[in-house]
Structures are given as C-alpha cells and as structure tokens.
Design a protein with these regions (language model features):
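Canonical Radical SAM [4Fe-4S] cluster-binding loop centered on the CxxxCxxC motif
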Residues: 99-137, 149
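Local cysteine-cluster metal-coordination motifs and their immediate loop/turn environment
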Residues: 113-123, 325, 340-343, 381-399
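Radical SAM enzyme [4Fe-4S]-AdoMet core and its adjacent flexible, acidic
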Residues: 1-3, 17, 178, 202, ...
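Long, charge-rich, low-complexity alpha-helical segments
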Residues: 35-108
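C-terminal accessory region of radical SAM enzymes
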Residues: 289-318, 343-394, 430-437
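Conserved Radical SAM active-site core
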Residues: 127-185, 189-205
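Cysteine-cluster motifs in flexible loop/terminal segments that predominantly coordinate metals
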Residues: 378-424
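Acidic, low-complexity/disordered tracts enriched in E/D and polar residues
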Residues: 1-49, 66, 472-474
Length: 476
C-alpha cells in the first residue's frame, strides 16, 4: 500500500503535462523535469485536474460531483506516487561553468585503413590508405589528456579497422595503464584465438558489425566472403569471456532479415540496430534509407521478442540538453586532428591537433565553446524547443542532421522514431509492455477536464498499484 499525501496538498500546475496511451495504460510526462508516471485512464484524468489551485481533496470532490465513485484514499495515494516520481517538481537545473567540464569519452582513430570497403562507410575507409603516425604518438596523446579526464575516461579504439594499425597492442596497453576504460569498434575479421584473449583482458566492450544472418545479406554492403570469419571472431571473443555486442546497420535491403541476426549468434551476444545514414560513401545511397515507421516497427518487434522489457538509461530529474559532442566527448583522427564528434570530421569543425597543440587550448578553446553552445536543445530550432521529450532526447543525433540537410541545428531525420521509442522506453521503465499501434500516432488526453469526465469509460482494469479503479506504476 502506498503512503498518501495530505488531502490539503495543492499540486503544482503543470502547463506542459502531456499524456500518451499504450493499450489500457497512460503515460503522464512532465517535459521540464523530465519526469513520468504510468497510470490508467482514471489516473490520467485525476492528474489533469491539478491546476495549481485545487487541493487533492478538491480534486476528489470534483470527481465525486460528476458521479465517479473513487475513494479519497485512492486519490491521495495516486498523487503521492506521482509526487515520488518527481512529476510535480519544478525541474530547473543550472549548467556547469565552461572550463570546469571533464573529458569523459574519446573516439581514437588509429588509422583510416581497413581490410573492407563497405558501401556506406562514413569514414570512406579502404585497404590502401596510409598510416600517418606511430604508436608512440598516440601513447603520448593518451597521457596528454589525463589531467583533463574523468577517472574512468572511455577510449573507443576505432578506424578504419584499428587492428590494422602497427602497434595496436602497445597503444591499448598504454591506455589500460592510464586507468582508462577501453572499448573497441571492429569488423571482427582479425580475431585470432590469441588476440581474442588480449581483447578480453583489455576491453570492457567490443562492438562488431554484422549486417545480416547470412552471407548473401551481409555481403550486399560489406563485401563477399567474410560473413563466416566475422561469426568466428564473435565466437572466439565470446569464448574468451569478452563482452561483445553486434551492430547491424539497417537498410531496406536487410530490414526483413534483422530479426534473424540474433539466431546465428551466441546467446550472450546482444544485437543493436542503427539506420544507414548519408555519410561518407553512404551519401550515394539515398534510396537505401529506411523511414521512421519501419524503424519503429523493428524496435517494437525486438521489444516483443524480449517480453516487452528493454533497458532504458533515462533518469527522472536528469536533463539531457544536448549531444555530448565537444562538451564531454571528442574524436581524434588518425592525423591527430581533434573534432567534437567522430561523425563531424570536417574542416569547419576541426578544433586543433593533439600532436601539435596543448590539449587544454583545444578542449576549452573558444571554437569548441561556441560549438557546444549552439548544441543546446532549446537553442536549435522551434520544433526541438517545444518538443515534449526534448530533455530526454537532447535534440537527437546532430550528425544525422548535418549529413541529411547540411545543418546540425536542424531536426533529426529520425525524430519520429526517437520520439516514439523514448515514449515506449518510458512505459517499459515502469514495467509496462508495449504493443504495436497503427502508424506513429497515439491517442492523447485533451479538452477541459470537466467535459472529459462526462465521457469517461469503464475504470475496470488489472491493478499493479492501488485499488479503486486507479492503476499506477513508476520508474522507481
């Protein structure tokens, strides 16, 4: 049984309070905190009556006057649970002063050379590209960043194919000695049993690209003859105890096969999906981009395969105002050039060179500061500024926007997918399985509360919270 608020308590007015429906459940979302709360239709109507002047007891009397038989105790329990979920918090957070931030994540491109030549590669990697610097240069760079970094700075080793870099192991060992957390992005083609043991020892996470369950599907984008080798590399890493993830880049061609990828992998290896984007060689493949509805359908299909419960990293009361590019994250090219993001390797976004300039001047420099300032979700555009999930989304992937329309301050081309998926995730965080709906739209709770109550449907439902026709679940 929930503890109850005092009936005389007056909940804050929530002018941006939004409601979304999935089946018999309703999500109440306060975008400004952000905070959310899942209830049924009756609970949603009660929350809508909070106008900043009515006490909980007043709200109960109003309901009773309209012939709705709900006990006061059940109403006070509902508002107590919503209060604990931070739904009625003010939701204002100050930002840290520029220059006080610490480096949290680095994409380290040891080389742009690769043993594959994928059709959509955003780095346009290929086998014949040069090696620009030695292992010692990158080891020095790792030490250079340490005074500016968090205790568990994440170094993502990438390329190209990072294992084609001479001295790969030496740079990795130096990163481990610095106390950094190592992550690896690889195509999985160069995983010998011995290397699998080395990777398992030094990397906390490995992401391997696999674009289909069969050679035919996989080879359409990544070249023929390597599907079996990639699967072998995945199994070797899994057998060595490494934490392996598989990433599938989704296009209309492999979309019908995405749900089969997990079947060819060890049970311990999860699958992640990302849409093909118009970056690098992918700019030539505009016809091969999936739309928002298709990506939503894929995500929901995966949710059903896991009983509708997928993890979410959203934290009530924690605002995501922007992508972390430049603010906490940077990318270092194989030339030593520093950029805010690994998908922003363009001259206009170059912040400096780690081999020739002091890192503090690069990281705290005016160019980076100006870039980060323009990344604020409320400064980007009118659509993001007024969006109900703006502080959960943070404005989406600015690289997607940059490469799609030429302006990173615009709206992510997968805005519809992001918004729907976040809503689904909030339901799941409260233990509610999400079922598919027709299209992207969902019903909303609109109109004056008094008129809404006149058409109120049956309150009978399975209860996960209190009785009395009010159902409630929270993310806590």
């Amino acid at each position: 049984m929930y503890k109850s608020v005092d009936p005389s308590w007056v909940p804050l007015a929530l002018p941006e309070l939004t409601f979304r429906q999935r089946g018999e459940y309703w999500l109440a979302l306060n975008p400004t905190v952000p905070a959310w709360f899942v209830t049924n239709y009756a609970g949603a109507l009660l929350l809508q009556l909070a106008d900043g002047s009515r006490a909980v007891a007043d709200i109960h009397r109003l309901i009773v006057d309209f012939g709705i038989d709900i006990e006061l105790g059940h109403v006070t329990e509902l508002f107590e649970s919503a209060k604990k979920s931070l739904l009625f918090s003010a939701g204002r957070q100050s930002e840290n002063e520029w220059g006080s931030q610490q480096l949290a994540a680095v994409h380290l491109h040891l080389t742009n050379r690769c043993n594959l030549q994928c059709t959509y590669c955003f780095r346009e990697s290929s086998p014949g590209l040069p090696i620009h610097y030695t292992a010692d240069h990158f080891i020095d760079a790792l030490h250079t960043m340490k005074p500016f970094a968090t205790e568990n700075l994440k170094i993502t080793f990438t390329g190209g194919e990072p294992m084609m870099f001479p001295g790969f192991e030496s740079v990795v060992e130096a990163s481990t000695e610095c106390g950094y957390t190592n992550l690896l992005l690889t195509n999985g083609m160069l995983i010998s049993p011995e290397r699998a043991e080395f990777i398992a020892q030094h990397f906390s996470s490995i992401t391997i690209s696999l674009d289909g369950p069969t050679e035919e599907v996989h080879s359409a984008t990544r070249g023929r003859g390597n599907h079996k080798r990639v699967l072998q590399g995945i199994r070797r890493l899994a057998d060595a105890g490494a934490k392996v993830h598989v990433k599938v880049t989704v296009s209309p061609d492999n979309l019908p096969y995405c749900d089969q990828v997990a079947k060819v992998l060890p049970d311990t290896v999860p699958v992640q999906f990302t849409p093909m984007m118009p970056m690098g060689r992918g700019q030539e493949l505009h016809r091969d981009f999936i739309d928002n509805d298709a990506f939503v359908g894929l995500n929901r299909g995966l949710a059903r395969a896991t009983d509708g419960r997928m993890s979410t990293s959203y934290m009530p009361g924690h605002r995501s105002r922007r992508c972390h590019a430049g603010l906490f994250n940077i990318s270092i090219a194989d030339t030593g050039d520093v950029y805010p993001c690994h998908l922003f390797h363009q001259d206009q976004f170059k912040l400096g060179n780690i081999f020739t300039q002091p890192f503090g001047e690069i990281f705290f420099g005016e160019q980076n500061r100006s870039y980060v300032k323009t990344m604020d979700v409320e400064a980007n555009n009118d659509i993001c500024r007024s969006c109900e999930v703006r502080f959960l989304c943070g404005g989406g992937c600015k690289a997607n926007t940059l490469h799609s329309i030429g302006d990173y301050r615009g709206v992510d081309r997968y805005c519809g997918y992001i918004k729907t998926t976040i809503t689904d995730d909030l339901f799941r965080s409260c233990g509610v399985a999400v079922e598919p709906v027709d299209g992207m739209e969902v019903e909303t709770l609109t109109g004056r509360p008094e008129s809404t109550f006149l058409g109120m449907p049956s309150m009978a439902s399975k209860s996960t919270g209190t009785g009395g026709g009010i159902e409630m679940t929270t993310s806590a």
